[in-house]
């Protein structure tokens, strides 16, 4: 799949190596089983090291900040640090069902992804549909006299795992998935 990045300076999402723009009208299906967390080490505005694990394996695989390998010296004023990261896997609801990974080390990005993780977990606990269909959006805010942007993962609908599976194999179309339609039961063949 492709990596999806968001710029807090421009408010633009960019997809893959060619920095393709993201269609604001494109729906994405979030896979809660793909939720990840970890650390990204930034030097000279580039990620030079990453540690990533499933949020469900945090107790066994999680790494504390004090246990991270040093890539110093760091220029903290230039943002050279190990930064916390959250992320999720998604599937574009397009003709090819492209797989995408969206991660963020910014506070606003982690807050947006973290909120979606919390909402999915809360819905799952009470047996409600817990797979969000989202649009990638953004909002502006002022910081130190500058206009900045934060990513917003805007849920259009929450769907069940069985409906999502039916959509992915073509048994439901996107409108039916958004509407919350249940997958059709396949008729069992009678043995002769």
Predicted features by range, described:
Residues 1-98, 143-170:
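OB-fold ssDNA-binding interfaces and closely related basic DNA-contact patches used
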Residues 25, 115-122, 175-179:
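Polar/charged alpha-helical tracts
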Residues 97-105, 111:
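Short helix-loop boundary/capping segments
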Residues 114-135:
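Short nucleic-acid-contacting surface segments enriched for D/E, G, S/T with interspersed K/R
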Residues 140:
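Short, surface-exposed polybasic-aromatic patches that bind anionic ligands, especially phosphate groups
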Residues 164-192:
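Acidic, gly/ser/pro-rich intrinsically disordered tails
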């Amino acid at each position: 799949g492709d990596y999806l990045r968001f710029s807090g300076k421009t408010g633009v999402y960019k997809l893959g190596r060619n920095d393709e723009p993201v269609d604001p009208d494109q729906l994405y299906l979030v896979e809660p089983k793909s939720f990840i967390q970890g650390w990204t080490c930034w030097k000279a505005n580039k990620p030079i090291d990453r540690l990533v694990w499933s949020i469900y394996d945090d107790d066994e695989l999680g790494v504390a900040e004090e246990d991270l390998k040093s890539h110093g010296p760091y220029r903290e004023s230039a943002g050279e640090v190990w930064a916390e990261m959250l992320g999720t896997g998604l599937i574009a609801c397009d003709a090819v069902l492209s797989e995408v990974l969206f991660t963020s080390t910014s506070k606003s990005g982690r807050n947006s992804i973290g909120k979606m993780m919390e909402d999915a977990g809360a819905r799952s606990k009470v047996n409600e549909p817990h797979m969000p269909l989202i649009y990638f959006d953004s909002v502006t805010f002022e910081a130190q006299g500058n206009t900045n942007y934060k990513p917003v993962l805007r849920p259009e609908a929450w769907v069940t795992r069985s409906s999502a599976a039916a959509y992915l194999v073509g048994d439901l179309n996107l409108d039916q998935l958004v509407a919350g339609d249940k997958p059709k039961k396949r008729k069992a063949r009678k043995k002769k």
